[in-house]
A protein has these predicted regions:
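SAM cofactor-binding core of SAM-dependent methyltransferases
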Residues: 1-74
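Class I S-adenosyl-L-methionine
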Residues: 72-195
Length: 195
């Protein structure tokens, strides 16, 4: 609301949230904005039908999008992304004696039986295609076995956000976790029921 006031308090704003979870942050933000006389159109970028149902309950009238690119382009954005980028898929690269390769899941030599079972049936393998051009600057000469992660989707989404802000005006508040510098190692983990 403060930024909206400083920008001239235009009534034509879009509140856009990327990955709004259950809609709680949006509901709270909209309640605060209303105290300043701001009632923007609400647009959520969310792919999960289950979460869309919860968000529609929390913020009736919200419009849903699969992608940032489909958001309206006719007015300034108030864009919020809370832990959105953390949820995007990563691509793992592993340094081999032959250079950088994508780290993939493959079958052990024993493979699977007819029922799809097998002891230690899956393992990480290095892909066949060179991936040296996907390695961030300054990381090419790491020792074999080094793993790094990249997120091509993050760059694409951020590029679209930047383009929209430059053309439409507005502001983005992005809250995410990360490191100032690239780190090596795998962050992949399996999570079920928040464990």
């Amino acid at each position: 609301a403060d930024i909206w006031s400083r920008a001239g308090a235009s009534p034509d704003q879009l509140y856009c949230e990327l990955g709004p979870g259950r809609g709680t942050l949006a509901k709270d933000a909209l309640r605060s904005m209303a105290r300043f006389g701001l009632s923007p159109q609400v647009h959520f970028v969310e792919g999960s039908p289950v979460l869309r149902a919860l968000q529609a309950e929390a913020v009736p009238g919200a419009q849903f999008h699969e992608d940032v690119a489909s958001l309206p382009e006719d007015r300034p954005l108030l864009l919020v992304a809370n832990e959105f980028f953390d949820a995007l898929p990563v691509r793992q690269l592993v340094r081999t004696d032959a250079g950088w390769r994508e780290r993939m899941i493959g079958l052990d030599d024993g493979g699977l039986d007819d029922a799809g079972q097998g002891e230690d049936a899956f393992r990480f393998v290095a892909g066949d295609q060179p991936m040296d051009s996907a390695v961030p600057e300054g990381w090419a000469d790491q020792p074999p076995g080094t793993i790094i992660e990249t997120c091509p989707a993050a760059a694409a989404v951020m590029g679209e956000i930047a383009r929209r802000l430059a053309e439409q005006g507005g502001v983005a508040l992005i809250v995410d976790y990360g490191h100032l510098r690239h780190r090596t190692g795998s962050t992949l983990q399996a999570v079920a029921q928040h464990r």
